[in-house]
């Protein structure tokens, strides 16, 4: 007898109609009378459950009728088409075997639970409808990203998680050490002597793989990274996590416009791929999580993203007459309220904001001719704000060194990065997409903790 996934039965119903199959999964609901009963089974392969009908002719009918929610079972039976019924087909069971029983105190009973409560039981929340949908979409989106870049001829590069450099120059990094923190070795000045540490110097968890990706872009032309990054920011907002995933493409022989073109294509590709391959999940999100989600995503796919300079954005915000919590003036870092106003009230679609003041951007971004702004661009989307940040990289060694000196960065710490500018340097550009923010945008979920399997935030490292 053929063992099949529930997804196969839904996608190829006619093929299996009238045939005997075997499925395995977990009980979502069960109700029974004296003569027959119904079990909703989910095997994790598909968003929807499959209905199993079992009758009193089964020798273990009474035992089956008492199975608890979340018990795991195997079912053998015939696939029967049910025209006009709620479900398109069901399985008439000829054999039901209990694989593993569930205790009666199983937390996910048939009622609506808050997302906050479900975060406290992260080991069980994938079994709920909402999180079953979220993490299936997350999987599809990750695959879509790889497929997009592979089809475009990009090389996938694994950059280090443990690093000695700080890409952002922010200093908000998790330190990696094997020293005894209660009695660390000290140098002549009384400071911790990291020469005695495992790596012989200070080491941290990476905040970005960009600098290392640039190395490979200058050998392979177009590359991308996709991996975890870490920020030791004591921030408890719905948009920030201490551990998250980033997609970071780098392109040689490319300018700012090229990065924006690729980023726009990528975002549209991800949306289309998920819409096509997870229609049931997306309908669920549209109905129960964020009404209007599908319309908004369709608008993104079918529109040309707006492109405005930072200076233009500031002028628009100042002339809007809107009251913002953070006043708008040239030189500030745009806040989420400003970003959302631009995308939701002014343009009603995604917006690239370009040419930011150099003082609020990183050292590696290419200086513009005005010596006040850099060739940077952030992609802002309705409902969230920034999801992508990127720039053309500074390829001119003298200007890069001057910029580092201006910011107090030691050349010795970035000797290899500077050396790239000496051996066949070319214009190049890249960006970073926060994967979880993309998932939030795709699903309408309002908190980053609900699109990461095991969220890491200040004070939280369970599971």
UniProtKB/Swiss-Prot annotation:
It is an enzyme of class 6 (ligase). This is Asparagine--tRNA ligase. The gene is asnS. Coiled coil: none annotated. It comes from Clostridium novyi (strain NT). It is found in: Cytoplasm. Its EC number is 6.1.1.22. Belongs to the class-II aminoacyl-tRNA synthetase family. Homodimer. It catalyses: tRNA(Asn) + L-asparagine + ATP = L-asparaginyl-tRNA(Asn) + AMP + diphosphate + H(+). The lineage of its organism: Bacteria, Bacillati, Bacillota, Clostridia, Eubacteriales.
């Amino acid at each position: 007898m053929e063992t099949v996934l529930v997804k196969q039965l839904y996608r190829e119903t006619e093929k299996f109609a009238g045939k005997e199959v075997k499925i395995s999964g977990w009980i979502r609901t069960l109700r029974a009378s004296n003569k027959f009963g119904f079990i909703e089974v989910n095997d994790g392969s598909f968003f929807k459950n499959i209905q199993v009908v079992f009758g009193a002719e089964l020798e273990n009918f009474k035992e089956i009728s008492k199975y608890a929610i979340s018990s795991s079972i195997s079912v053998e039976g015939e696939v029967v088409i049910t025209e006009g019924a709620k479900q398109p087909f069901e399985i008439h069971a000829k054999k039901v075997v209990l694989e593993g029983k569930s205790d009666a105190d199983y937390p996910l009973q048939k009622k609506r639970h808050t997302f906050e409560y479900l975060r406290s039981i992260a080991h069980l929340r994938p079994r709920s409808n909402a999180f079953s949908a979220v993490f299936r979409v997350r999987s599809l989106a990750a695959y879509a990203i790889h497929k997009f870049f592979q089809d475009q001829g990009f090389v996938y590069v694994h950059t280090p998680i443990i690093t000695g450099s700080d890409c952002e120059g922010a200093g908000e990094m998790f330190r990696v050490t094997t020293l005894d923190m209660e009695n660390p070795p000290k140098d002549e000045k009384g400071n911790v002597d990291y020469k005695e540490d495992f790596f012989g110097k200070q080491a941290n968890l990476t905040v970005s793989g960009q600098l290392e990706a640039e190395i490979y872009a200058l050998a392979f032309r177009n590359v991308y990274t996709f991996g975890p990054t870490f920020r030791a920011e004591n921030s408890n907002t719905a948009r920030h996590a201490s551990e998250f995933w980033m997609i970071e493409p780098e392109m040689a022989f490319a300018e700012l416009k090229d990065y924006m073109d690729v980023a726009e294509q990528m975002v549209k590709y991800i949306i289309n791929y998920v819409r096509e391959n997870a229609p049931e999940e997306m309908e669920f999100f549209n109905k129960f999580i964020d009404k209007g989600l599908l319309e908004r995503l369709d608008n993104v796919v079918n529109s040309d993203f707006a492109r405005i300079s930072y200076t233009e954005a500031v002028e628009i915000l100042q002339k809007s007459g809107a009251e913002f919590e953070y006043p708008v003036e040239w030189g500030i870092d745009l806040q989420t309220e400003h970003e959302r106003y631009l995308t939701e009230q002014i343009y009603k679609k995604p917006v690239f904001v370009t040419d930011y003041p150099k003082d609020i951007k990183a050292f590696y971004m290419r200086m513009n001719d005005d010596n006040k702004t850099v060739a940077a661009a952030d992609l802002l989307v309705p409902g969230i704000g920034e999801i992508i940040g990127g720039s053309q990289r500074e390829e001119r060694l003298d200007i890069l060194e001057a910029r580092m000196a201006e910011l107090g960065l030691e050349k010795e710490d970035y000797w290899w990065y500077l050396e790239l500018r000496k051996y066949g340097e070319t214009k190049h550009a890249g960006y970073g997409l926060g994967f979880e923010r993309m998932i939030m945008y795709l699903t309408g979920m309002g908190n980053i903790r609900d699109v990461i399997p095991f969220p890491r935030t200040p004070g939280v490292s369970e599971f």
